[in-house]
Amino acid sequence: MASGPSVFLLNVSGQIESAEFPEFDDLYCKYSFVYGHDWAPTSGVEEGISQITSKSQGGKQALVWNFPIEITFKSTNPFGWPQIVISVYGPDAFGNDVVRGYGAVHLPFTPGRHARTIPMFVPESSSRLQRFTSWFMGRRPEFTDPKVVAQGEGREVTRVRSQGCVTVSFNVVTKDLKKLGYNTGSGDFPNATTMSQP
Amino acid sequence: MNSHTHELHYSPTCAVMAEVHIIGQIIGASGFPQHSLFCKWGVHTGGAWKLLSGVVEGQTQVDHPQNDDMAFWSHPIDMHFATKGLQGWPKLHLQVWHQDTFGRNELYGYSFLHIPSTPGTHSLLSPTWRPLGTWQEQICQMFVGGGPQLKSSSLIYGGSDRYRLQTVAMGQVHLQLTVILRNFERYGVECS
């Protein structure tokens, strides 16, 4: 029996390029991946933590990390396609690190170079009393596990405030996805309508 | 060269069925009068469709955005269907709700869209509408808030009973969805 491939590979390299947070400075970010049961990383780094960056002096006020990502996954089934989860932290007025944003996006599906702008958000206190205590104690609400932002269930109880965004670029190579019968189309946006950025 | 092109490995659970993966995000919404918004969503398919994995309905987080021109939900979607036919291609229906500072929810818009049949990544904008009600109800809504809602969500994605409604345009929902197809070529079905 001629045995064809039984798994496909998804190789992603890229970088967390930069962020826009008009209100905050001296930020660093962490990244990790969330993927389904059929998926497994075969090589590369599954999580990382960047340097602390300050805003540029010029008018653009960019926060540049230029932080590398390299990972390869294998799977038999696109269900549970990996998502990159990014969380951004920075010092508050007392010098304690607090979260400034969580965000997630699926890794691109087609071979080639892709750029993604990920909107970031932080959870909010659900009651006025909690809001007061968090203001008084100088601790703002955080997710105990940032990976919840890649999950769809149980989000109806979450209140968030969106602020800022992170720009990530990816280079994607796939292997044997077509041989296993999957058609992911080609090109990034075959019939794209322009997405308005905040 | 390709002696095994016709002997591809198919998963045993659905050896002969065509498969559709729908993966992506409900990104957020813009163009609404207020932007403290959340969204209830669901996917409706015909009888020939079988859900193999994933969830087909849910509710997003409530966003109170810092800058008030767009609400972000970044709500992930991941579904795997098997189908015997093209009839009843999946439709996504959306309900956008506004949450005020007291935690009260009011309906801001309904919308539906067909999942694109072309494989690939699609950036989509789905315009929404809400029922208008009678003029008495409209005046009441100006003072009290709230407003008429549909009794059955089938009106959102069905066309047969819409002629009874008077509606008004609301904002739009931004989505990015990737469609992955499998085994459609086997049956001569051309999707791209």
Curated annotation (Swiss-Prot), chain A:
Known PANTHER family for this protein?
B9 DOMAIN-CONTAINING, B9 DOMAIN-CONTAINING PROTEIN 1
This protein is called: B9 domain-containing protein 1
Biological source species: Xenopus tropicalis
Name of the encoding gene: b9d1
Q: What is the lineage of its organism?
A: Eukaryota, Metazoa, Chordata, Craniata, Vertebrata
Q: Which keywords annotate this record?
A: Cell projection, Cilium biogenesis/degradation, Cytoplasm, Cytoskeleton
Q: Where is this protein found?
A: Cytoplasm, Cytoskeleton, Cilium basal body
Function comment = Component of the tectonic-like complex, a complex localized at the transition zone of primary cilia and acting as a barrier that prevents diffusion of transmembrane proteins between the cilia and plasma membranes. Required for ciliogenesis and sonic hedgehog/SHH signaling.
Instruction: Spell out the family assignment given in the record's similarity comment.
Output: Belongs to the B9D family.
Q: Which GO biological-process labels does this protein carry?
A: cilium assembly; smoothened signaling pathway
Gene Ontology cellular component annotations, sorted alphabetically: centrosome; ciliary basal body; ciliary transition zone; cytoplasm; MKS complex
**Assembly and interaction partners:** Part of the tectonic-like complex (also named B9 complex).
